[in-house]
Amino acid sequence: MTLTALNAISPIDGRYVNKTRALSPYFSEFALTYYRLMVEIKWFESLAANDTIPEVPALDNKARKFLSDLISNFNESEAEKIKEFEKQTNHDVKAVEYYLKDKFQENEQLKSCVAFIHFACTSEDINNLAYALMIKQAIAQVIQPTIAEIMGSITLLGKQHADVAMLSRTHGQPATPTTMGKELVNFVARLKRPQQQLAEVLIPAKFNGAVGNYNAHVAAYPEVDWRKHCANFVTSLGLSFNAYTTQIEPHDGIAEVSQIMVRINNILLDYTQDIWSYISLGYFKQKTIAEEVGSSTMPHKVNPIDFENAEGNLGLSNALFIHFANKLTQSRMQRDLSDSTVLRNLGVAFSYSLIAYHSVAKGNDKLQINKSALQKDLSENWEVLAEAIQTVMRRYNEPNAYEQLKELTRGQMIDAENLKKFIKTLSIPEEAKAELMKLTPETYTGLATQLVKAFS
């Protein structure tokens, strides 16, 4: 059976393949094979560039081009050849080594140097660099731009509705008014910090042999400064070097990335749940598409499916990222292999996040403010002005200010007339009374509008 979106087991490669395809160059089996091949070639080139290793001569132009072409021209057909070697070896990294040994026979200079492919390496030297590069590129090329798009769309909504007054709800009950714009930009302000941390996080990598001590390196070439050579090699690939490891790089960097992703996703979970609630309250309507159906039985339905989809996928993503952060930082003694199968699922976690991000962006595009619903809620909850009145009373030392307003408003249905009658009885300056008399739930929004306009 040919794998298609219809018969794929995972919805990542099935139903949602159009949303996740952008991650395929970084997290597919082909991608892992490609990055392993690249690391093996770059390591060989570093040996050739070290004049204290005479057995690997400096590469001539033909050899350099040959190696460069192996990387740039690598395709699925070549990857299948590596998979054929793996059928013999039952070892994926060794299969890459054998593939390169076979390829080196095609170049006059390189065929005499096949012994230096995978020289002094353990598989984890190759793998940890490959995974680090995959994560780094996926974040830079796919995840960060998509997060930035969401932040931009929420900011735009916030700016558009900067002065649209809204009844707040704390504990689900009416509270001090705000503006819709202010509540939206709050989420962007929260996202800025983890987004910046995700951009700056360094994923460490090791290249120090079977148990982290350069044992084989030193046995073969004791005169080479392997610590310096390997550190330079790792940093030349744009990664930070971890000099103190066991056989594996301890994955603390991947754990850090995972925890940052969880924080980003939790903020977006909070956002999707709030938007869902605002839609439920009628504060937002959703643009309809004529051909779409909201319910198989209720023709009138326009459901907030994009935000619900995002909520579900963010939860799936977080479950995996939390597992990565907890699991990958633990390995028995100098290593066990239980991290290997977990690492192969890195792309799954990022994919669920990406599906969710696309759903949030799609949902945002459908939102239309319903000012009449917002105004109706405000006009029915004049009791929220009790805070303003008792605070002004305190300024002028009116006795028992809080208690007076509590007695007047707590659990009561209050309208404008009730409040104005109460204000007239106060022993505060007439100017202060006049200001309170002008106050309405719709105008009692503090600096909310200014905060949105100042936000960037």
UniProtKB/Swiss-Prot annotation:
Pathway: Purine metabolism; AMP biosynthesis via de novo pathway; AMP from IMP: step 2/2; Purine metabolism; IMP biosynthesis via de novo pathway; 5-amino-1-(5-phospho-D-ribosyl)imidazole-4-carboxamide from 5-amino-1-(5-phospho-D-ribosyl)imidazole-4-carboxylate: step 2/2. Belongs to the lyase 1 family. Adenylosuccinate lyase subfamily. SUPFAM superfamilies: L-aspartase-like. Keywords: Lyase, Purine biosynthesis. InterPro entries: Fumarase/histidase_N (IPR024083), Fumarate_lyase_CS (IPR020557), Fumarate_lyase_fam (IPR000362), Fumarate_lyase_N (IPR022761), L-Aspartase-like (IPR008948), Pur_lyase (IPR004769), PurB_bact (IPR047136), PurB_C (IPR013539). GO terms for biological process: 'de novo' AMP biosynthetic process; 'de novo' IMP biosynthetic process. It catalyses: N(6)-(1,2-dicarboxyethyl)-AMP = fumarate + AMP; (2S)-2-[5-amino-1-(5-phospho-beta-D-ribosyl)imidazole-4-carboxamido]succinate = 5-amino-1-(5-phospho-beta-D-ribosyl)imidazole-4-carboxamide + fumarate. The keyword Lyase applies. N(6)-(1,2-dicarboxyethyl)-AMP binds at residues 15-16, 90-92, 122-123, 247, 296, 301-303, 309, 335, 340-344. It comes from the Bacteria. Pfam families: ASL_C (PF08328), Lyase_1 (PF00206). This is Adenylosuccinate lyase. GO terms for cellular component: cytosol. Its EC number is 4.3.2.2. GO terms for molecular function: (S)-2-(5-amino-1-(5-phospho-D-ribosyl)imidazole-4-carboxamido) succinate lyase (fumarate-forming) activity; N6-(1,2-dicarboxyethyl)AMP AMP-lyase (fumarate-forming) activity.
